[in-house]
A protein has these predicted regions:
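Class I S-adenosyl-L-methionine-dependent methyltransferase catalytic core
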Residues: 1-168
């Protein structure tokens, strides 16, 4: 679940959904199989298990591999919590957020971490073009007004994950 700014009138909208084809493509491409969607609704979850607003993923332990497309007005809070959960439990995480490399959270939890030696693996994959997120299961007229980036927190590198996915 996420909030995007509407292209036409800058109103904030809730409950935008990651298109399932995008989610599946990136999971396959990155060798990931998230077990839990940590900020979703029953209608838009991408995983068999999910935390919704009522169960509050920010108060849960993420002891399984996870996916998140957080509310855009709360990205910093969710990224910080995701990083802490990753450090504590070491489960692979896949994150879809807006591609704004000038933000404090991006530098603190993505860019700075990727430069550290002996660090957990942090990978970024900018999305080509703009994603057209679903609204209540249907495509709106316009895509998101900015680009997106897929971020991976993992203890294993991409090559190792892909080999594992192939049973090697």
């Amino acid at each position: 679940m996420t909030t995007h700014l509407d292209n036409m009138n800058s109103r904030k909208k809730q409950n935008w959904e990651t298109p399932i084809d995008q989610f599946m493509e990136w999971c396959s491409r990155l060798g990931l199989s998230p077990a839990i969607d940590v900020c979703a609704t029953k209608a838009n979850t991408k995983c068999a298990k999910y935390f919704d607003k009522r169960s509050n993923g920010l108060k849960k332990q993420w002891t399984e591999s996870w996916f998140m497309n957080p509310p855009y007005n709360e990205v910093a809070v969710w990224i910080r919590y995701a990083w802490n959960q990753f450090k504590e439990y070491g489960q692979d995480g896949l994150i879809l957020v807006f591609n704004k490399t000038d933000t404090k959270w991006y530098h603190e939890f993505v860019w700075d971490q990727s430069k550290l030696k002996n660090r957990p693996n942090v990978e970024t994959y900018p999305q080509s073009g703009r994603i057209t997120f679903l609204e209540n299961g249907t495509l709106p007229e316009n895509p998101a007004p900015y680009g997106s980036v897929w971020i991976v927190f993992s203890k294993t590198k991409l090559r190792e994950r892909l080999l594992r996915q192939c049973g090697l």
